[in-house]
A protein has these predicted regions:
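N-terminal/domain-start segments enriched in small and hydrophobic, helix-friendly residues
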Residues: 2-18
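Conserved N-terminal/central alpha/beta ligand/cofactor-binding core
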Residues: 4-5, 36-37, 42-172, 178, ...
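Core beta-strand elements of the Rossmann-like FAD/NAD(P) dinucleotide-binding domain
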Residues: 8-11, 181-191
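N-terminal Rossmann-like FAD-binding beta1-loop-alpha1 element of flavoenzymes
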Residues: 13-40
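Short, well-ordered coil/turn residues at beta-beta hairpins
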Residues: 17, 195-196
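Short glycine/serine/threonine-rich phosphate/pyrophosphate-binding segments
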Residues: 22-25, 196, 201-204
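A conserved FAD-binding loop/helix module that cradles the flavin
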Residues: 205-226
Protein backbone atom coordinates (compact mmCIF):
# COMPACT_ATOMS: atom_id res chain seq x y z
CA UNK A 1 0.00 0.00 0.00
CA UNK A 2 1.26 3.45 -0.90
CA UNK A 3 1.41 6.42 1.41
CA UNK A 4 -1.97 7.26 2.90
CA UNK A 5 -3.11 10.79 2.15
CA UNK A 6 -5.70 13.11 3.65
CA UNK A 7 -8.32 14.65 1.37
CA UNK A 8 -10.25 17.77 2.40
CA UNK A 9 -13.64 18.68 0.96
CA UNK A 10 -15.64 21.81 1.81
CA UNK A 11 -19.31 22.09 0.90
CA UNK A 12 -22.56 23.76 1.82
CA UNK A 13 -24.53 20.56 2.45
CA UNK A 14 -23.01 17.19 3.33
CA UNK A 15 -25.24 14.11 3.09
CA UNK A 16 -23.90 11.16 5.09
CA UNK A 17 -25.27 7.95 3.60
CA UNK A 18 -26.32 7.09 0.07
CA UNK A 19 -29.28 4.78 0.60
CA UNK A 20 -32.82 5.77 -0.32
CA UNK A 21 -32.93 8.48 2.34
CA UNK A 22 -29.51 9.89 1.44
CA UNK A 23 -30.02 9.93 -2.31
CA UNK A 24 -33.47 11.41 -1.79
CA UNK A 25 -32.04 14.08 0.51
CA UNK A 26 -29.40 14.91 -2.11
CA UNK A 27 -32.11 15.42 -4.72
CA UNK A 28 -34.20 17.56 -2.37
CA UNK A 29 -31.18 19.61 -1.31
CA UNK A 30 -30.53 20.54 -4.92
CA UNK A 31 -34.20 21.35 -5.51
CA UNK A 32 -34.25 23.83 -2.64
CA UNK A 33 -30.65 24.99 -2.94
CA UNK A 34 -29.90 25.61 -6.59
CA UNK A 35 -26.60 27.41 -5.98
CA UNK A 36 -25.29 25.30 -3.11
CA UNK A 37 -22.40 22.86 -3.21
CA UNK A 38 -23.81 19.46 -2.27
CA UNK A 39 -21.75 16.36 -1.46
CA UNK A 40 -23.04 12.85 -0.74
CA UNK A 41 -20.82 10.25 0.97
CA UNK A 42 -21.60 6.51 0.92
CA UNK A 43 -19.71 3.53 2.37
CA UNK A 44 -20.71 1.27 -0.56
CA UNK A 45 -21.87 2.48 -3.98
CA UNK A 46 -25.07 4.48 -4.25
CA UNK A 47 -26.26 2.43 -7.24
CA UNK A 48 -26.78 -0.59 -4.99
CA UNK A 49 -26.57 0.47 -1.37
CA UNK A 50 -28.87 0.66 1.61
CA UNK A 51 -32.01 -1.27 2.47
CA UNK A 52 -33.40 -1.03 -1.08
CA UNK A 53 -30.19 -2.18 -2.78
CA UNK A 54 -31.70 -5.44 -4.00
CA UNK A 55 -34.96 -3.82 -5.08
CA UNK A 56 -38.49 -4.18 -3.74
CA UNK A 57 -41.73 -5.67 -5.00
CA UNK A 58 -43.92 -3.02 -3.39
CA UNK A 59 -44.01 0.53 -2.07
CA UNK A 60 -45.29 0.09 1.45
CA UNK A 61 -47.24 3.32 1.74
CA UNK A 62 -49.36 5.14 -0.83
CA UNK A 63 -52.45 7.16 0.07
CA UNK A 64 -54.15 7.29 -3.32
CA UNK A 65 -55.61 10.69 -2.49
CA UNK A 66 -56.34 11.49 -6.13
CA UNK A 67 -58.77 8.55 -6.16
CA UNK A 68 -60.01 9.17 -2.60
CA UNK A 69 -58.69 5.77 -1.50
CA UNK A 70 -57.05 7.04 1.70
CA UNK A 71 -56.28 10.36 3.34
CA UNK A 72 -53.40 11.34 5.68
CA UNK A 73 -55.79 11.21 8.64
CA UNK A 74 -56.45 7.55 7.88
CA UNK A 75 -52.76 6.71 8.03
CA UNK A 76 -52.29 8.60 11.29
CA UNK A 77 -55.17 6.61 12.78
CA UNK A 78 -53.64 3.34 11.54
CA UNK A 79 -50.20 4.18 12.99
CA UNK A 80 -51.70 5.28 16.30
CA UNK A 81 -53.62 2.04 16.68
CA UNK A 82 -50.71 -0.15 15.57
CA UNK A 83 -48.30 1.48 18.02
CA UNK A 84 -50.83 1.71 20.85
CA UNK A 85 -50.68 5.50 20.94
CA UNK A 86 -46.88 5.85 21.00
CA UNK A 87 -46.61 7.93 17.85
CA UNK A 88 -45.79 11.46 16.74
CA UNK A 89 -49.01 12.17 14.90
CA UNK A 90 -47.69 15.41 13.41
CA UNK A 91 -44.76 13.61 11.78
CA UNK A 92 -46.97 10.78 10.56
CA UNK A 93 -49.39 13.24 9.00
CA UNK A 94 -46.58 15.19 7.33
CA UNK A 95 -45.15 12.00 5.80
CA UNK A 96 -48.56 10.83 4.63
CA UNK A 97 -49.46 14.08 2.88
CA UNK A 98 -46.26 14.04 0.83
CA UNK A 99 -45.94 10.34 -0.04
CA UNK A 100 -48.24 10.36 -3.08
CA UNK A 101 -46.31 13.10 -4.88
CA UNK A 102 -43.07 11.21 -4.24
CA UNK A 103 -44.49 8.02 -5.73
CA UNK A 104 -45.70 9.98 -8.77
CA UNK A 105 -42.18 11.33 -9.18
CA UNK A 106 -40.73 7.81 -9.13
CA UNK A 107 -43.30 6.87 -11.77
CA UNK A 108 -42.14 9.77 -13.96
CA UNK A 109 -38.51 8.70 -13.49
CA UNK A 110 -39.29 5.31 -14.97
CA UNK A 111 -40.02 3.00 -12.03
CA UNK A 112 -42.23 0.22 -13.45
CA UNK A 113 -45.57 0.39 -11.61
CA UNK A 114 -48.20 -2.35 -11.66
CA UNK A 115 -51.66 -1.04 -12.57
CA UNK A 116 -55.20 -2.32 -12.49
CA UNK A 117 -56.09 -3.08 -16.10
CA UNK A 118 -59.66 -1.85 -15.69
CA UNK A 119 -59.21 1.34 -13.67
CA UNK A 120 -55.62 2.34 -14.46
CA UNK A 121 -54.95 2.85 -10.78
CA UNK A 122 -51.85 1.51 -9.07
CA UNK A 123 -52.38 -2.14 -8.15
CA UNK A 124 -52.72 -2.62 -4.41
CA UNK A 125 -51.80 -5.43 -2.04
CA UNK A 126 -53.76 -4.61 1.07
CA UNK A 127 -54.83 -1.16 2.19
CA UNK A 128 -51.52 0.70 1.95
CA UNK A 129 -49.10 -1.11 -0.39
CA UNK A 130 -48.89 -0.70 -4.14
CA UNK A 131 -47.11 -3.22 -6.33
CA UNK A 132 -44.04 -2.41 -8.45
CA UNK A 133 -41.41 -4.14 -10.56
CA UNK A 134 -38.76 -2.79 -8.24
CA UNK A 135 -35.44 -4.34 -9.26
CA UNK A 136 -34.39 -0.96 -10.65
CA UNK A 137 -35.78 1.04 -7.72
CA UNK A 138 -32.47 2.10 -6.16
CA UNK A 139 -30.54 2.76 -9.40
CA UNK A 140 -33.33 5.09 -10.56
CA UNK A 141 -33.17 7.18 -7.39
CA UNK A 142 -29.36 7.03 -7.38
CA UNK A 143 -29.33 8.52 -10.87
CA UNK A 144 -31.34 11.50 -9.62
CA UNK A 145 -28.80 11.99 -6.83
CA UNK A 146 -25.90 11.87 -9.28
CA UNK A 147 -27.49 14.62 -11.34
CA UNK A 148 -28.12 16.68 -8.20
CA UNK A 149 -24.84 16.43 -6.28
CA UNK A 150 -21.67 18.31 -7.07
CA UNK A 151 -19.75 15.25 -5.91
CA UNK A 152 -20.61 11.68 -4.94
CA UNK A 153 -18.03 9.85 -2.83
CA UNK A 154 -18.48 6.08 -2.92
CA UNK A 155 -16.54 3.65 -0.70
CA UNK A 156 -16.00 6.25 2.04
CA UNK A 157 -16.82 4.97 5.52
CA UNK A 158 -17.73 7.86 7.81
CA UNK A 159 -16.49 7.16 11.33
CA UNK A 160 -17.04 10.41 13.23
CA UNK A 161 -19.06 13.59 12.98
CA UNK A 162 -17.21 16.86 13.53
CA UNK A 163 -18.61 19.49 15.85
CA UNK A 164 -18.62 23.14 14.85
CA UNK A 165 -16.04 24.97 16.96
CA UNK A 166 -17.92 28.27 16.73
CA UNK A 167 -21.46 27.04 17.51
CA UNK A 168 -22.28 24.80 20.46
CA UNK A 169 -24.01 21.47 19.77
CA UNK A 170 -23.84 21.95 16.03
CA UNK A 171 -22.37 19.42 13.60
CA UNK A 172 -19.94 20.99 11.14
CA UNK A 173 -18.70 18.03 9.13
CA UNK A 174 -17.52 14.44 9.21
CA UNK A 175 -14.41 12.31 8.82
CA UNK A 176 -13.91 8.86 7.36
CA UNK A 177 -11.68 6.72 5.21
CA UNK A 178 -11.69 5.14 1.78
CA UNK A 179 -12.39 1.43 2.16
CA UNK A 180 -10.23 0.55 -0.86
CA UNK A 181 -7.23 2.86 -0.49
CA UNK A 182 -7.21 3.71 3.21
CA UNK A 183 -7.00 7.44 2.48
CA UNK A 184 -8.54 9.75 5.10
CA UNK A 185 -11.31 12.16 4.15
CA UNK A 186 -12.30 15.31 6.03
CA UNK A 187 -15.59 16.91 5.04
CA UNK A 188 -16.44 20.39 6.30
CA UNK A 189 -19.97 21.63 5.75
CA UNK A 190 -22.39 24.40 6.68
CA UNK A 191 -25.12 21.79 7.16
CA UNK A 192 -24.99 18.00 7.58
CA UNK A 193 -27.82 15.59 6.80
CA UNK A 194 -27.31 12.23 8.52
CA UNK A 195 -29.01 9.46 6.55
CA UNK A 196 -26.81 6.60 7.67
CA UNK A 197 -29.37 3.89 8.29
CA UNK A 198 -32.63 2.96 9.96
CA UNK A 199 -33.34 0.86 13.00
CA UNK A 200 -35.00 -2.50 13.54
CA UNK A 201 -34.79 -5.27 16.16
CA UNK A 202 -34.74 -2.68 18.94
CA UNK A 203 -37.92 -3.91 20.61
CA UNK A 204 -40.07 -7.02 20.59
CA UNK A 205 -43.00 -6.90 18.17
CA UNK A 206 -46.42 -7.11 19.80
CA UNK A 207 -48.13 -9.26 17.15
CA UNK A 208 -48.00 -13.07 17.33
CA UNK A 209 -45.72 -14.39 14.60
CA UNK A 210 -44.40 -10.94 13.73
CA UNK A 211 -40.89 -11.92 14.82
CA UNK A 212 -40.68 -14.47 12.02
CA UNK A 213 -41.82 -11.84 9.55
CA UNK A 214 -39.02 -9.49 10.57
CA UNK A 215 -36.12 -11.92 10.32
CA UNK A 216 -35.34 -10.55 6.86
CA UNK A 217 -34.10 -7.31 8.41
CA UNK A 218 -30.33 -7.30 8.16
CA UNK A 219 -28.08 -6.84 11.23
CA UNK A 220 -26.92 -3.46 9.97
CA UNK A 221 -30.40 -1.97 10.47
CA UNK A 222 -29.82 -1.53 14.19
CA UNK A 223 -29.92 2.22 14.75
CA UNK A 224 -26.19 2.51 15.44
CA UNK A 225 -25.46 5.11 12.75
CA UNK A 226 -25.20 8.46 14.53
CA UNK A 227 -28.89 8.50 15.55
Amino acid sequence: MGKIKTVYEDCDILVVGGGMAGTGATFEARYWGRDLKIVCVEKANIDRSGAVAQGLYAINCYMGMQWNENQPEDHVRYARNDLMGLVREDLGYDMARHVDSTVHMFDEWGLPMMRDEKTGRYLREGKWQIMIHGESYKPIVAEAAKKSADKIYNRIMITHLLMDESKENRVGGAVGFNMRTGDYYVFRAKAVIVAAGGASHIFKPRAVGEGMGRTWYAPWSNGSAYA
